[in-house]
Amino acid sequence: MSKSENLFAAARELIPGGVNSPVRAFTGVGGTPLFIERADGAYLYDADGKAYIDYVGSWGPMVLGHNHPAIRNAVIEAAERGLSFGAPTEMEVKMAQLVTELVPTMDMVRMVNSGTEATMSAIRLARGFTRRDKIIKFEGCYHGHADHLLVKAGSGALTLGQPNSPGVPADFAKHTLTCTYNDLASVREAFELYPQDIACIIVEPVAGNMNCIPPQPDFLPGLRALCDEFGALLIIDEVMTGFRVALAGAQAYYNVVPDLTCLGKIIGGGMPVGAFGGRREVMEALAPTGPVYQAGTLSGNPIAMAAGFACLSEVAQPGVHSTLDALTTQLAEGLLDAAQEAGVPLVVNHVGGMFGFFFTDADSVTCYHDVVKCDVERFKRFFHLMLEEGVYFAPSAFEAGFMSVAHSEEDINNTIDAARRVFAKL
């Protein structure tokens, strides 16, 4: 047995499913998950010493690559001064200044510890500010594991939401309306059914939790217009897309102004950090200046703030996003060409430093209903054959891929060459 297999067997006796986040268990592809010993640049090294070109990037944060010296040194320096104070620090102020400079729609920002905390708190704030209860989310979009977000559509487009996890009370789920991504008509229908009850829309500007689905040109502006028409807030969940699709996020790339923005992943440089922020009048409804409560013992943790500040300072340098986009485009076009040469039907979506590919005969993939029609079994075979080639894609057909500026053109070419060999076997 490999060391990963031994570790997984031991982990399953101690940790539910052997992992601390479900997708890591390889349940979407089968087999034994890789146990990682270390990472550097564009590469992961597993417990058995094998190297992999990594397109997961810790599920998004590693836009600069693994073990970046500026981030590592910032963490070491901060740790020497103490790990947690439970009191304000100068670095929190510097971090808030940097975030609000980089994302102009955020007048104020509150630091938290995860993307889930960010979305959960932003929705509570929207409900408190508007004094309304219902929210709109989109089928196939993921905004963390808060109870009111673990909701699927009912039997009809506008039936009350149903929990998609045991432990979520139906009384919570009934306040969540689930619409179809890239379908403005379904959103208008929801507003017309509940014109005085909807507090907010929360949306991934590029849906990264049903692989990678960019918005149609009219979708995000249409959501903004509907929120304005019906007095709801627009929350853009940039946990994945923030500082990755563009420096100021997908909201800048697609030219839409939200009321609130949620951030995570890159904002922590690999440490557990989330944030939410937006219009001053909305944010000032948050405790202690307002009545909407939110708190956290480790929020604004000095180590995490140091890592995040170092990461964002590097990400803001000229050329980072043009490099990221060029590398992602090279990979996306190369995978598509290789698949076509082998006669394998494939759709590839990409924007900024995100990408996704779908084994399907369809011309395009634009929503959850398209995604679930794709050939998951073919993806599983592709994943494992690429893993044998030393290339690590997300172990799920429903997760986006992430590029870093640490990837070289040689890494991309080697990946495409490996894919060409694998497509020939499919």
Swiss-Prot record:
User: By what name is this protein known?
Assistant: Glutamate-1-semialdehyde 2,1-aminomutase
What interactions and quaternary structure are annotated?
Answer: Homodimer.
> Is the keyword Cytoplasm in the record?
yes
What GO MF terms are annotated?
glutamate-1-semialdehyde 2,1-aminomutase activity; pyridoxal phosphate binding; transaminase activity
Which keywords annotate this record? Cytoplasm, Isomerase, Porphyrin biosynthesis, Pyridoxal phosphate
An example Gene Ontology CC term for this record: cytoplasm
* Record InterPro entries: 4pyrrol_synth_GluAld_NH2Trfase, Aminotrans_3, Aminotrans_3_PPA_site, PyrdxlP-dep_Trfase, PyrdxlP-dep_Trfase_major, PyrdxlP-dep_Trfase_small
Q: Which reaction does it catalyse?
A: (S)-4-amino-5-oxopentanoate = 5-aminolevulinate
Q: Which organism is it from?
A: Cronobacter sakazakii (strain ATCC BAA-894)
